[in-house]
A protein has these predicted regions:
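Active-site loop segments of alpha/beta catalytic cores
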Residues: 1-192
Length: 192
């Protein structure tokens, strides 16, 4: 949102803004947050059951900087849904050890990517928060035996963690084998 059509996804210009022009950055964050809150309220008024906030580039910001200067704005957006009795899912991609900063006041469920083992994410998260994730979508390029081996390990995790939702650690990748997607969906349905 800071710079459209940016080909470089390390966002150095945004991080530089955080360090050099903190007041300007805070003003921009406040504007984005207020617009997002209005959007969330309208979504809830239109009947959504759950709101998910994606922080796809969370991991490019140092954890301390994200926790101190971005997470409070994410919390405000998520709280707008929570204040209207709407469940929330928060996906701070690649936040990893920062997951320890999440609590029930921020979200109902934390979605995690494949960069952190699901068991580690669970130990970092407050036990009141559900967890969603974290299959690496690139696994769809593998064969069914390899996929099933991974699903078996997740199944064991699911038996011990009833507040877990199976999901990818991020979206689908172009070119994946749809037969493998169907295999995963069927496997999850049959092993629930």
């Amino acid at each position: 949102m800071f710079r459209r059509n940016e080909l470089n996804k390390d966002f150095n210009h945004v991080i530089k803004l955080f360090y050099k022009e903190r007041k300007k950055c805070i003003k921009i964050m406040e504007m984005i947050t207020e617009a997002s809150i209005e959007y969330v309220k309208k979504q809830v008024d239109c009947g959504i059951d759950c709101f998910q906030l994606f922080e796809t580039y969370c991991g490019i910001i140092p954890e301390q900087l994200y926790t101190e200067f971005v997470l409070p704005y994410s919390r405000k957006i998520l709280n707008a849904a929570m204040n209207k009795n709407c469940k929330t899912i928060f996906f701070p991609k690649n936040y990893n050890l920062g997951l320890k900063h999440l609590n029930k006041d921020i979200c109902d469920i934390a979605s995690v990517d494949w960069q952190i083992p699901i068991e580690t994410a669970r130990t970092l998260l407050n036990s009141d928060i559900g967890i969603q994730g974290n299959m690496d979508p690139r696994l769809f390029f593998s064969d069914k035996n390899e996929i099933e081996k991974y699903l078996m390990s997740l199944s064991e995790f699911g038996k011990k963690n009833t507040n877990w939702i199976f999901n990818l650690g991020h979206g689908f990748i172009p070119g994946i084998d749809v037969k493998n997607v169907n295999f995963v969906v069927d496997w999850i349905k049959n092993h629930n």
